[in-house]
């Protein structure tokens, strides 16, 4: 029997083609992931060099009075204090939400910040007081405009502390956590009373190295040796502990593998504030009235 006359195994060519497609897709995914990591690493090195050369470390985008008339979204970086993650959040929001988008720089500059930014509770509460006053001044000048806070990683601490300091008659609209470093058992009732729409918490079980092991060893932003809300989400209290049903305003979104293809979010800590993720999932909630 000639080779061409041999019976072909059913589906063999399709199986090979499917296998090639899967490998090609996997390689493209990995290339995107590595490009993201290289870009972030390069920008952090650039920031460090700027500090060594005595150049400004913090940079702020200019906002117009017309933007401020429409609302204000404040972005809090993580314990790195500034850099590509904060810039990614701003870029993801600026083109997708109404009003001004500004970074609130609360941390000690890179590289000496990091752990002190996570662990120095007194300083973080002082920065939270500054943030609360900034919000009140904005509300005095632009009453009735929407105000939101978006906090990444360790920025979740100063963010929620600031909300808790607001008078009950001076609520803001919403608070967003991206890979937040607050303990998963934190009592949110004080903050939820001061939020119209509530808290939007994005979390990922893949973030267990930083927000599981890391926060268990070094503590969360609220100084608990505990797994963080950015890894497992916030734990809801019993009904008896929440008679006002405030936790109805806690909205939680869990990472899922489909987000890799959807917006390049791999679920680990370095992707918790990615620009595409913020634009597609955070911005619509902020824009919603």
Where are these regions (language model features)?
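C-terminal catalytic-base region of ester-bond hydrolases, centering on the histidine
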Residues: 6, 210-289
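Serine-dependent carboxylesterase/thioesterase catalytic core
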Residues: 73, 77-84, 88-232
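Residue-level detector of functional hotspots within protein domains
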Residues: 59, 65, 87, 161, ...
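Flexible, membrane-associating and regulatory peripheral segments of lipid-active enzymes
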Residues: 1-105, 122-126, 133-142, 168-173, ...
């Amino acid at each position: 029997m000639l080779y061409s006359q041999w019976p072909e195994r059913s589906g063999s060519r399709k199986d090979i083609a499917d296998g090639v497609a899967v490998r090609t897709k996997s390689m493209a995914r990995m290339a995107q992931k590595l490009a993201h990591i290289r870009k972030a690493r390069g920008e952090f090195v650039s920031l460090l060099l700027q500090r060594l050369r005595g150049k400004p470390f913090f940079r702020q985008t200019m906002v117009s009075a017309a933007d401020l008339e429409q609302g204000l979204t404040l972005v809090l970086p993580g314990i790195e204090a500034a850099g590509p993650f904060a810039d990614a959040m701003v870029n993801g929001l600026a083109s997708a939400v109404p009003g001004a988008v500004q970074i609130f720089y609360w941390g000690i500059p890179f590289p000496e910040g990091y752990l002190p930014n996570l662990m120095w509770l007194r300083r973080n509460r002082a920065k939270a007081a500054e943030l609360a006053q900034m919000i009140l001044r904005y509300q005095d000048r632009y009453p009735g405009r929407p105000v939101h806070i978006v906090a990444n990683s360790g920025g979740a601490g100063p963010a929620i502390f600031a909300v808790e300091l607001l008078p009950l008659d001076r609520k803001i609209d919403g608070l967003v956590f991206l890979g937040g470093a607050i303990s998963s058992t934190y009592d949110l009732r004080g903050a939820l009373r001061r939020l119209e729409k509530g808290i939007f918490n994005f979390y990922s079980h893949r973030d267990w190295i930083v927000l599981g092991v890391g926060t268990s060893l070094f503590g969360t932003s609220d100084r608990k040796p505990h797994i963080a809300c950015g890894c497992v989400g916030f734990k809801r209290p019993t009904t008896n502990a929440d008679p006002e049903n405030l936790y109805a305003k806690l909205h939680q979104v869990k990472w899922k593998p489909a987000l890799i293809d959807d917006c390049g979010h791999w679920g680990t800590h370095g992707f918790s504030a990615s620009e595409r993720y913020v634009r597609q999932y955070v911005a619509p909630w902020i824009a919603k009235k």
